[in-house]
Amino acid sequence: SGKSIHLLLYGILSMQFLFMEMQWINSGCIHSGEYFHGPFEVTDYDVPFMLVKSIGHTRHLDERVENFAKKFTEDLLVLDQKDLDLSTVADEAKPYVAAILTGVVIRHFVEAIAFERGHSLDVRRYMWQMQY
């Protein structure tokens, strides 16, 4: 979850783009506020989760998701924006800057996945390969 709906929507689209389109990993992006409206039913020991804990006013939602998910999966990666050094950023701008930096961290994470899997981020199965 996060401060700006524009950055949130961009983040959701970016994660879908990186994991699904570029790595062919079946995934979904769920706002913490929506998690308990059904998506939490897929939480299981063999289902990996990546949680971005915001520093904004929705952090309590992220913490609620984290507390629940920890009980039912051992494959939970938490990217906590509190771990970012934002000491030189104005307080009112921190949630926005944190959202942007989180996108950079996730991009590097996906690049590492691509390297480990031997699946370049440039490879496409259908896109640009044929008429569709």
Where is each model-derived feature located?
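A SIS-like phosphosugar-recognition module
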Residues: S1-Y132
